[in-house]
């Protein structure tokens, strides 16, 4: 059975259609996926030039086509997503689902794989890479991950992939990668006012072998291996970066694992009234940025801060003590309730953002379940501070990284 799911669009004036292809995460795969996505975003065999491809999309009343790879745990999802005005909003008899879908597949099924376009994309990406990692916080995260996954280097890059593979790729490499990608597990997702018509128009294009393969992944999450490390790296910037990474196990009950880190991240650093913000400012008298993020698919709870290089030990102590406090069962109920309200608001507002709806369809397809935003709101309402404490107790400090 072909992997396709088009939901009924009942609230937006624009429709969305996307093809998603799943391949294993490795630095080389991510580099080639990034390069291919950049090339396809620029031009295609039927629209051989940036201007020609842009004009083709403009004629569809400024349709937007986004092509990019994204890392989900141990997988890369190559995403081809088009957002376009619903035909019933336009008084143009020549503008319809069929025309939009034809152009969508004209572009994504027919890449222009030549040396000139590839060199342009490589230069673009090299410039983006250097600019992105010139920012200390981005560089610190990159090096933190490489250290975290030092025993599993295939997982050590979440963006760009290997710069060496990206720079050294040949046209033949990209052609082979594109051919292999067509065999990868794939799914077509979307939202349209007339989902049946959209499905009928899409079906003839979904002939690649991957659309018949199971898209769901049973072991998407990368297990955190307990192997503590501390690393200090010098840097020329005035501010330093500190990253404290905690691992946690995969055997937690699903809801506890899914929402424990989410609640803890908001509790510690969700806004300026959260624990870390107030404690850092009270003790150090400075408005340093503090961030706590739960990387659910990586079994990684990460707390990071941009700091005065002379105060990183004080900031580290505050971070570590704040986590230990929760592990000891000490929770500020007022801050916890604020976190609950903030998370509930996020899920209540999510259905009004079309892009988030498609992301939910994708994550549900990857995990093989149907979780709605209503389910998430209910889970947040029922989640207790005792459960957050239970989650915190499973954390083990696995890496301290300092960019100073």
Regions inferred by a protein language model and the residue ranges of each:
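Extreme N-terminal starter segment of soluble prokaryotic enzymes
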Residues: 1-4
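His/Glu-based metal-binding/catalytic segments typifying zinc-dependent metallopeptidases
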Residues: 6-33, 37, 212-274
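A generic structural motif
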Residues: 22-25, 41, 84-90, 248-252, ...
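Charge-rich, well-structured scaffold segments of protease-associated domains
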Residues: 55-215, 283-404
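Cytochrome P450
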Residues: 22-29, 47, 69-73
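Catalytic Zn2+-binding segment of zinc metalloproteases
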Residues: 41-47
């Amino acid at each position: 059975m072909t992997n396709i799911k088009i939901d009924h669009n009942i609230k937006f004036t624009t429709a969305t259609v996307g093809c998603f292809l799943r391949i294993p995460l490795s630095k080389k795969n991510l580099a080639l996926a990034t390069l291919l996505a950049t090339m396809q975003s620029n031009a295609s065999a039927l629209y051989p030039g940036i201007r020609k491809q842009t004009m083709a999309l403009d004629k569809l009343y400024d349709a937007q086509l986004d092509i990019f790879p994204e890392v989900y745990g141990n997988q890369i999802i190559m995403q081809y997503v088009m957002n376009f005005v619903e035909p019933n909003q336009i008084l143009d008899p020549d503008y319809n689902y069929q025309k939009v879908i034809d152009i969508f597949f004209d572009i994504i099924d027919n890449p222009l794989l030549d040396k000139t376009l590839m060199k342009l994309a490589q230069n673009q990406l090299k410039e983006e890479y250097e600019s992105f990692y010139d920012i200390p916080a981005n560089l610190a995260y990159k090096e933190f991950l490489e250290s975290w996954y030092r025993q599993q280097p295939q997982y050590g890059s979440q963006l760009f992939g290997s710069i060496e593979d990206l720079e050294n790729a040949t046209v033949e490499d990209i052609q082979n990668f594109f051919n292999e990608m067509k065999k990868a597990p794939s799914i077509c997702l979307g939202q349209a006012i007339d989902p049946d018509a959209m499905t009928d128009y899409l079906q003839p294009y979904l002939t690649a072998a991957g659309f018949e393969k199971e898209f769901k992944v049973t072991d998407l999450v990368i297990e955190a291996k307990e192997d503590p490390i501390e690393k200090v790296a010098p840097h020329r910037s005035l501010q330093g970066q500190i990253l404290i990474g905690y691992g946690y196990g995969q055997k937690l009950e699903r809801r506890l694992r899914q929402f424990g880190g989410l609640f803890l991240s908001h509790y510690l650093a969700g806004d300026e009234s959260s624990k870390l913000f107030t404690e850092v400012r009270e003790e150090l008298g400075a408005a340093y940025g503090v961030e706590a993020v739960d990387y659910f698919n990586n079994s990684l709870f990460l707390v990071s801060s941009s700091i005065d290089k002379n105060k990183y030990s004080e900031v580290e102590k505050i971070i570590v003590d704040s986590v230990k406090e929760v592990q000891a069962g000490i929770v500020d109920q007022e801050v916890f309730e604020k976190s609950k309200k903030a998370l509930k608001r996020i899920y209540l507002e999510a259905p009004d953002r079309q892009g988030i709806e498609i992301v939910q369809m994708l994550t549900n397809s990857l995990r093989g379940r149907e979780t709605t935003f209503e389910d998430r709101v209910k889970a947040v309402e029922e989640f207790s501070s005792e459960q957050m404490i239970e989650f915190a107790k499973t954390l083990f400090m696995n890496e301290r990284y300092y960019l100073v």
